[in-house]
């Protein structure tokens, strides 16, 4: 992988501007609903990232739509094009289950991968740009940040791109996660993390090891794109997101110790929120419009108390909105889809392609094509998708087709479903499985069912009937008609 070089978010914005991928908005625009309207229209048209230089009522510019096209996601991951993300996936598959060299020649073939791994360790700085300006105590005021209100019935302004940094009591490695945070006071946010996410797991372990003690948390806003994307990529549990970001960027990730705790944050981030979660301090979060296109239920989550705000000079506030696809999470899903394919193929070599349609809210429906080898094979692949990567724990529907079907063409997929499936025989229903908390269609919050559709050709043992043979054109006839097609002038 030849990394597209940039050091921090500002470098990346310069790169985008040089390629016509960034638009500066000088007209005053309100972070309350108006920025969402403009960003939504721009994203749906495949437009540029937007830097609102004069948000109404605030002195800090707002960056939106940063990852609004698959190309910009690829650029953030150090690549020129989305197709190159397959190489990122191959590297992750290698790191997840590295294979020792089989000989001297194989060692040389693997050297590029080992060389990339050497870029992984972080570089710790004594001082950093993210600590150029410091507010603490009574000077902490989150209302000075141009936090967006995205939809008319949202409960309050919402931080959407907060890179949350935590560490469990028994872990050397920090966890990075993107969790939305509702603004409820000058120094108070609600930390909405689901129970299986890394930050929530760190918090639960802390409560068990240090009952009654405050849990240190830091949040980075405006980190460099590689670090942000590292937090939403299926990085192996043994690898830190910072290390993976360094791999993407081609240089070690620079971090700095926080002022009030021992957590390490991206040194070049625009803004850092430092603070703690008081055990037992909870608050009702929501409702908010989310990536499903609906407002979610109100539920209680921990309160994050901010004790310090540090930031760069002339800091930029990075934000987004979530709504019915297409939105930024859906675009991220399209790009990261290419990363997932090699990881799945390493575990299941029979998989030819894997596709998460963006209209399926990024992860709720998956289409898999495979080289089927035996009766029941499609069901094995279904179960593998649900269990191998935790990113697909919430995937409700898995459709499995043969490799003569294009997973990314609904015409092909629907044809396979309607001609190769018997609804009773080829539908797999699994009850009482983990489901996204935001999925109000499930009968119980966080618990619901899954459906697998086996749309493959059936083998002996799966059917007693003679199976249909697909129609295939005679290639000689096709060639003869190709030769006279223009002469026929049918469409002239």
UniProtKB/Swiss-Prot annotation:
Sequence positions that bind Mn(2+): 175, 241
Gene3D superfamilies: Single helix bin (1.20.5.570), UbiD C-terminal domain-like (3.40.1670.10)
Annotated signal sequence range: none
Lineage: Bacteria, Pseudomonadati, Pseudomonadota, Gammaproteobacteria, Enterobacterales
Name under which the protein is recorded: 3-octaprenyl-4-hydroxybenzoate carboxy-lyase
UniProt-listed InterPro entries: UbiD, UbiD-like_C, UbiD-like_N, UbiD_bacteria, UbiD_Rift_dom
Membrane topology according to the record: Peripheral membrane protein
Enzyme class (EC, first level): lyase
């Amino acid at each position: 992988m030849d990394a597209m070089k940039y050091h921090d978010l500002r470098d990346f914005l310069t790169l985008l501007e040089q390629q016509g991928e960034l638009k500066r908005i000088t007209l005053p625009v309100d972070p309350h609903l108006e920025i969402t309207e403009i960003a939504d229209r721009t994203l749906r048209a495949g437009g540029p990232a937007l830097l609102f230089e004069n948000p109404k009522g605030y002195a800090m510019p707002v960056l939106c739509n940063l990852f609004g096209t698959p190309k910009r996601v690829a650029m953030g991951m150090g690549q020129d094009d989305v197709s190159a993300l397959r190489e990122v996936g191959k590297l992750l598959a290698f790191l997840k289950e590295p294979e020792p060299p089989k000989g001297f020649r194989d060692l040389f073939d693997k050297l590029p991968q080992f060389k990339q791994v050497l870029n992984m360790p972080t570089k710790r700085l004594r001082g950093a740009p993210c600590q150029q300006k410091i507010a603490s105590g009574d000077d902490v005021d989150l209302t000075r940040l141009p936090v967006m209100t995205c939809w008319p019935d949202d409960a309050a302004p919402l931080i959407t791109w907060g890179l949350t940094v935590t560490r469990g009591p028994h872990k050397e490695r920090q966890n990075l996660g993107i969790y939305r945070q509702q603004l409820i006071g000058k120094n108070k946010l609600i930390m909405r993390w689901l129970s299986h996410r890394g930050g929530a797991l760190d918090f639960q372990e802390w409560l068990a090891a240090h009952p009654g003690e405050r849990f240190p948390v830091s949040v980075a806003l405006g980190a460099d794109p590689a670090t942000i994307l590292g937090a939403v990529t299926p990085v192996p549990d043994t690898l830190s997101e910072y290390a993976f970001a360094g791999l993407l960027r081609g240089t070690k990730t620079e971090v700095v110790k926080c002022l009030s705790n021992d957590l390490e944050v991206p040194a070049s981030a625009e803004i850092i929120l430092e603070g703690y979660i008081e055990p037992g301090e909870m608050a009702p979060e929501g409702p908010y419009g989310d990536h499903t296109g609906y407002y979610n239920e109100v539920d209680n989550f921990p309160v994050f108390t901010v004790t310090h705000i540090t930031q760069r000079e002339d800091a930029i506030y990075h934000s987004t909105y979530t709504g019915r696809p297409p939105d930024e999470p859906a675009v991220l899903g399209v790009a990261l889809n290419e990363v997932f394919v090699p990881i799945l193929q390493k575990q299941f070599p029979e998989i030819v392609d894997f596709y998460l349609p963006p209209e399926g809210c990024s992860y709720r429906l998956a289409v898999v094509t495979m080289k089927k080898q035996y009766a029941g094979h499609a069901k094995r692949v279904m179960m593998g998708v649900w269990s191998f990567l935790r990113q697909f724990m919430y995937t409700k529907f898995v459709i499995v087709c043969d490799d003569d079907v294009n997973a990314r063409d609904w015409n092909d997929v629907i044809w396979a479903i309607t001609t190769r499936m018997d609804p009773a025989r080829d539908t797999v229903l699994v009850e009482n499985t983990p489901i996204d908390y935001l999925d109000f269609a499930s009968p119980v919050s966080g618990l619901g069912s899954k459906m697998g559709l086996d749309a493959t050709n059936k083998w002996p043992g799966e059917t007693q009937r003679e199976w249909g043979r697909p129609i295939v054109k005679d290639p000689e006839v096709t060639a003869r008609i190709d030769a006279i097609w223009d002469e026929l002038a049918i469409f002239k």
